[in-house]
């Protein structure tokens, strides 16, 4: 049977087609560049005189005039300042002694003299009477500290201090011993089915099963191959001639006969497929001239003509603009001498004279009165300790302590509400140019512009009318044989042949490949119970407890790295039809089709409308230069275009100059607490503390390895239509694809039959076919003439070949035969009728790109595209100038507690005092005897932070430590008497057994975060969970206060009485807790807090 045809490779590119008919006229070209400047015109007439220039610069100063005449005497000047004293005159001679005068009147008392020196101390006078008590003097300055007095008795314990700030996490403890094995957990839910494992090796063959019941009849198998031909039977007796038999099988081809006489020409065969293009034929004889063609398209615009002759002079131009200011003129001649000046005013007073010499000393004064008494002497040595005084009045509350240290930064709060819109930012960079606005209305016609540059090549014009049929060329050489035609459709089923003899048994087939694994079998019966196992080793730490309630959603994390690409989703629905794409480049010229036969002439059509004007013809020779026309009127301004889009953001400007200093801001709130003081000396070691509560869950571990990609997601919703992308660059030509499936049979009529292939090798004998249906009886033959019955002859030679029988059913295709020898070329057949139009050939290689088309008019503005994705962050701008210092922030929230300090020793239990206000601490007393261990002391000063250890596993709670030995007691405890009057408060001793809930927060346990409540229906459920978890955490911590035997008093709260929720949060206001007389000195007590309402 003929082999299936395979499409051949693409043929070579056909010859270039004839040039297309001229294209339509192109659009008006762009305005050309301005022409070269014309030559300068002749000089205009002289303009009128310009306006006067501005005044020139001042001339240089003239030379000095001659001195004027002397002025008249001026009026007297004002009184001058007093001159310096003159020097003392020389001492005069002594005069003669005068006569004694009379006694004068007593003079006035002289002024008291300066105080004389201190007199010697007088003798001690007698003791005077005691004066009245003076008013209380001001407090003296504090004296130097006296030596410490003896230790007073221990005072009652003060109230516990407020909780200290939370300490930093301590260093990681060592890992505790492994606990006993926990109880076995309940079986988990069955996991999902694992992926199918690889096929196992084939097992050994099992024993043969019992014979199954016969199955239902199977579908009839395909017909087997024909069996080998059976041996000939013995010759039978000659029968009577039977009816005409069915056609026999085709015999083997006979030997080649001699050539017969030339037959008559057959009917023309069906046209074969077109052969490949022949080589170019010789040029035919020149045809007759055709009819005149249509008028050609106008040629391209000619280049600019030669330069014209200069025109005649134009009229005089308008008056010129005012000239620039002239240069300064030369210096003028020297001026005449001026008049004399006025007389000058009197001068300023002279400088002060020098100081005179000092006078002689005066006489001594009288003795002054005694001076005040001297200062007090130094304090004497301390006196003995006085008797114990009465208790003082309760003091006023002390001043507010200094603010504690700033807390550690709190956890990041919930995202706040969106802030108000910020002030407008700086002007952005200039945006990219916006799209062109719509064209404005046309202005009035301007003057004729200079000649434009030649326009771009126009688009190809429409197809011209068909030319007349050319004369036939010379006959080409015969083409090569075409490719083998496709296989014909399958013929009708032939009549069934006789049933063949059974074939021999075929060899056993090869062993089949192992089958796929069967489904799981039914569950087997339970096996017998095994023997009990030996005691196993203790198990590992038990499974974690039940999962706690869900926490609040965390803050939004930073954006994760881009995940791995997921598996391709199922294809989405078809999107909406896209916009029409841009016009493609013109394809390469197709091969010239066969020329059609001329159709009948149509009737004459009506006259067409007037055609568009042709392109401008070539320039004629330049005419003589015309006179210059008057200037045309200015055109009206065009309409204002729409504003373009905002430009891109400009570069940041240089920083502005510093502004003036602003007015001082308002007084800021109290600043943060100052730095922490230096660490105090460590106290004596404290008693063993209670075991800490279980630590909080450690920080999340490092990210696990990325999981396998998730299953493909379902198809997404139909996305919005994307913006139209820009046309991408042309891809490179792809490689030849694999051969496609054979197309449907074309409409071509059958090709010429190909040469006969060599006979294929004989197929394997087929299995015995099913019994065919009985054939139809053949047509009755003519009866033979009865011959004389001869004796039985021997078997004669084979008779001549009978006529060929009808075609049997087509056998299965044989293997492809080897190609036959090339036959000799047949004679040229007569030309067949014109074939139907062939199917489009494969696309040729892309032609060279055509010239660019003329730019089209500006299209209407498109709709705004969807908002683009956020672009990558731009580079950071340069830092702006520092802003003014903002006001001080509000006082921060109270920070976490500091680390626990080292515990102090336990003090003795004091007598019960008044419940007074907490006094200031007294000086440290000397250590008393070792008393019984007190409760844990308050938190000490915060130690320096150790380097944070890596978080250890949460250890199991340790067993309670042993109780310390009791201290010595004075005597047996007598029966309790009635409470006596309160005793005086003792001097403060070393800090003792006050006790503070802060000790519950162990260094590695962070107290529960204060919870927030919102008035929002969606948050109610979360809030309830959060309240639960907070209270559960509190109760777990307080549970560690239980007494050693586990008994405790509990007061349960049975309902939540909260009726309103304010949206604010509050701390549980347990400000202080002072257990009084709980029992024995080392008695523990418990406290459990249930739900609370804030009123």
Curated annotation (Swiss-Prot):
Compositional bias per record (Gly residues), positions renumbered to this chain: 161-179, 299-311, 602-611
InterPro entries given in the database record: Collagen (IPR008160), Collagen_superfamily (IPR050149), Fib_collagen_C (IPR000885)
Residue ranges, compositional bias (Pro residues): 1-21, 147-160, 699-712, 848-858, 976-988
Keyword Secreted in record: yes
GO molecular function: extracellular matrix structural constituent
SMART domains in the record: COLFI (SM00038)
PANTHER family per record: COLLAGEN ALPHA, COLLAGEN TRIPLE HELIX REPEAT
Protein name, UniProt field: Collagen, type I, alpha 1a
Origin species: Epinephelus caninus
